[in-house]
């Protein structure tokens, strides 16, 4: 890939250096302020702004009557001074005339309440009027500005589904029925897929099916999963409708801004339609894990871009306004976190917004030009970063690379969310995030990929809690192992089919043969619910003669693990001053071998009769699956004592030129220390290494091509040795020993 070209997908956005700027709303200011803004933009190094994002009421003040002259004049002036435009379609916030003239376009919540006008995103994604008028506006803008030399990017809508991810109106009811008809072909197939004989939910026709609005108790989980799919489909249809309208008149690249691992929309499906992946992200400066949040979200975006660069569309220069308390970024953190995004693949740093609002719901959201203007230290940070980015032109277009992939699956997240059990799921991509953070803390670069993405180039693939059984993913994982790679599958994977039907005969579905094990029972810990209910359990148990004798290991929050694996024991012994132990969390499982054992090979413990009848072994896992760790009875694991907690199956090489690989199964959610120890073991088998070994606390290293980013997230200066090359920010030569100031970055080219 050539430098200075962001070949994110099908239609490259050409840049002379990193994009820098932000959302700009000149309609909120007078003409004098606009001219002053142009001066300040040039002073700060701004080369791109996004305009028109919430301008529908100005662009179409009366239905069908467009007023584009004002925005055309703004685009012309920006182009005259050399500032590119990311032109939005304005459709994120329909105007008052739509709400008043077409009240049916307003969304309805699950309780049947139609929401009102006066905020933003107040539209039903199935509304015929909204869809027609949004497509018409996008098409008219493209016809007018589709070949304007100052417009370099189309920006459809804004943060789809951030407020309204579903609507329960009568139009959506009809559209849901139509969608089901296309998906299943008949109402009887819907009945089969949803299991409607349960609780007498059978339907005689598609017209009987309602939206899953407020109900007396648990709704049908399969219906809710399809409702998630339908809602994603409807909102995606709004976006593709505008995209098609634009494409009739313009070849300029098209995007819509994502929000990281946002759980409501399947961004992997959405990304296929876009030319450029863009992201909005607002980590909390008060959160010590904020830097990791940036690494995670950036790696997700790069994965959506199929490994190519992407653009940061929104961040704040200082503080946001929407948290209960809003902390500003610390000195140096604005630049540090911006360059961290570039280290993870972004070719631009854009903000919300250019000039801080003085009215409205985002008055106290930070901007590049704060309320205090140039008197604010934020302004100096903005100018400094602009200069820094000018010096980083060689980074543009360079690619990240990794030998390790973590798989995420949006539909599995939906399935976990809507399933009635085994546990509530309120933390999206919890498993993937945990493994990604462990890799990041170890200094290991990772890619975040989807279940259908190619995996053959990776040495290690981690499949964490992919709840829906994916046969194609299992086959791809087996190829990785057969080519000498390592595959890790974790608890909670391959539990249900595509319609939330339980995998019968043992969980792990299509992965059973690869792993050599299957799950016969979930054994989750609930935490100290009962004890929390007793104000003073110790005092109460003086008289609760019966209750005090009852054992409740499930009230614990952790499980102890034991290992006889020499390599893992060595790693555990190296952690901390006196070594450490293995521990699991609240999700645990009964694991048995997938091949039959003879009577003498069965463990002497109580198991369900059907399992014993099939001859499944527990201890020893007869066959080619070996036990790496067992539950040792500590914490809440007394009933699991002796059962496998981590297993490994060696996989024969696909051909004589390949080395054998391994497939590992982790039957609990390891805590962060245990996860780190285990990942060190597995990466050693995969011959994976940190980007730069032996870095001090707080220092992150990432590579884009041959360019090395060194980011000091700590409050102390750090000294590094062995750093050789040209430091791009200041243009200095590094000859081995370097010092990086607190919350600062070095970018070194060979």
Residue ranges and their predicted role:
Residues 1-50, 61, 76-80, 84, ...:
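N-terminal carbohydrate-binding accessory modules
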Residues 111-276, 280-296:
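Polysaccharide-binding and catalytic clefts of secreted carbohydrate-active enzymes
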Residues 28-43, 134-140, 259-270, 330-338:
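Short, acidic/polar
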Residues 203-209, 248, 260, 271, ...:
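Carbohydrate-binding surfaces of carbohydrate-active enzymes
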Residues 19-31, 52-69, 116-135, 160-165, ...:
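The substrate-binding groove and active-site-proximal loops of carbohydrate-active enzymes
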Residues 22, 41, 49, 78, ...:
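Conserved, mostly hydrophobic/aromatic
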Residues 35-43, 47-114, 142, 241-249, ...:
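Aromatic-lined substrate-binding rim segments of carbohydrate-active enzymes
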Residues 15-20, 45-47, 79-85, 147-152, ...:
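Short, well-ordered coil/turn segments that N-cap beta-strands
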């Amino acid at each position: 890939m050539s430098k200075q070209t962001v070949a994110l997908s099908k239609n490259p956005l050409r840049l002379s250096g990193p994009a820098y700027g932000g959302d700009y709303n000149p309609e909120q200011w007078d003409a004098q302020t606009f001219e002053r803004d142009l001066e300040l933009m040039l002073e700060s190094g701004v080369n791109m702004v996004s305009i028109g994002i919430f301008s529908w009421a100005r662009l179409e003040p009366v239905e069908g009557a467009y007023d584009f002259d004002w925005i055309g004049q703004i685009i012309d002036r920006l182009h005259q001074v050399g500032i590119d435009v990311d032109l939005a379609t304005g459709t994120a916030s329909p105007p008052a005339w739509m709400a008043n003239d077409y009240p049916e376009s307003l969304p309805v919540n699950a309780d049947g309440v139609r929401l009102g006008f006066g905020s933003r995103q107040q539209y039903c994604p199935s509304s015929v009027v909204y869809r027609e008028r949004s497509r018409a506006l996008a098409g008219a803008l493209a016809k007018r500005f589709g070949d304007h030399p100052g417009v370099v990017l189309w920006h459809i809508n804004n943060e789809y589904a951030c407020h309204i991810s579903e609507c329960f109106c009568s139009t959506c009811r009809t559209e849901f029925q139509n969608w089901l008809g296309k998906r299943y072909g008949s109402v009887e197939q819907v009945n089969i897929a949803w299991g409607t004989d349960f609780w007498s939910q059978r339907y005689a026709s598609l017209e009987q099916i309602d939206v899953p609005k407020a109900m007396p108790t648990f709704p049908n989980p399969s219906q809710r999963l399809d409702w998630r799919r339908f809602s994603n489909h409807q909102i995606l249809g709004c976006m593709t409708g505008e995209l098609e309208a634009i494409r009739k008149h313009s070849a300029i690249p098209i995007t819509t801004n994502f929000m990281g691992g946002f759980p409501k929309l399947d961004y992997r499906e959405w990304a296929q339609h876009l030319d450029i992946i863009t992201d909005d992200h607002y980590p909390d400066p008060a959160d010590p894990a904020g830097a990791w949040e940036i690494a995670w979200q950036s790696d997700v975006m790069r994965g959506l871009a199929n490994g190519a660069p992407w653009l940061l569309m929104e961040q704040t220069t200082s503080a946001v306004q929407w948290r209960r308390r809003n902390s500003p970024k610390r000195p140096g953190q604005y630049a540090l976190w911006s360059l961290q995004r570039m280290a993870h693949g972004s070719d631009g740093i854009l903000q919300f917004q250019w000039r801080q609002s003085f009215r409205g719901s985002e008055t106290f959201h930070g901007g590049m030009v704060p309320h205090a203007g140039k008197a604010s230290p934020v302004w100096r940070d903005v100018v400094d970063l602009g200069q820094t980015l000018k010096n980083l032109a060689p980074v543009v277009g360079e690619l990240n690379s990794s030998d390790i992939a973590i798989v995420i699956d949006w539909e599995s997240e939906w399935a976990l969310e809507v399933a009635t059990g085994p546990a509530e799921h309120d933390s999206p991509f919890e498993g993937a995030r945990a493994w990604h953070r462990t890799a990041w803390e170890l200094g290991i670069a990772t890619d975040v990929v989807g279940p259908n993405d190619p995996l053959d180039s990776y040495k290690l693939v981690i499949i964490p809690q992919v709840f829906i059984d994916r046969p194609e993913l299992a086959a791809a994982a087996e190829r990785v192992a057969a080519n000498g790679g390592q595959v890790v599958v974790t608890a909670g994977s391959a539990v249900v089919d595509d319609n939330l039907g339980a995998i019968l005969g043992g969980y792990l579905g299509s992965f059973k043969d690869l792993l050599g094990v299957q799950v016969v029972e979930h054994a989750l810990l609930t935490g100290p619910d009962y004890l929390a209910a007793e104000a003073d359990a110790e005092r109460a148990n003086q008289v609760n003669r019966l209750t005090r004798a009852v054992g409740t290991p499930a009230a614990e929050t952790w499980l102890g693990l034991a290992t006889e694996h020499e390599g893992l024991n060595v790693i555990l012994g190296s952690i901390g001053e006196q070594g450490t132990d293995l521990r699991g969390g609240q999700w645990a499982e009964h694991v048995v071998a997938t091949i039959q054992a003879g009577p003498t090979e069965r463990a002497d413990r109580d198991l369900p009769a059907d399992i014993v009848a099939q001859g499944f072994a527990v201890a020893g896992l007869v066959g080619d699956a070996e036990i790496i760790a067992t539950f040792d009875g500590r914490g809440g694991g007394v009933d699991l004592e002796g059962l496998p907690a981590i297993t490994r199956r060696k996989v024969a090489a696909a051909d004589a030129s390949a080395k054998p690989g391994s497939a590992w199964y982790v039957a609990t959610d390891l805590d962060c220390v245990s996860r780190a120890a285990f990942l060190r073991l597995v990466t050693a088998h995969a011959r994976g290494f940190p980007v730069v070994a032996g870095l001090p606390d707080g220092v992150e290293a990432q590579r884009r091509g041959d360019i090395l980013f060194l980011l000091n997230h700590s409050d102390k200066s750090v000294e590094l040795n062995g750093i050789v090359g040209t430091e791009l920010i200041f243009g200095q030569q590094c000859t081995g020993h370097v010092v990086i100031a607190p919350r600062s970055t070095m970018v070194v080219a060979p």
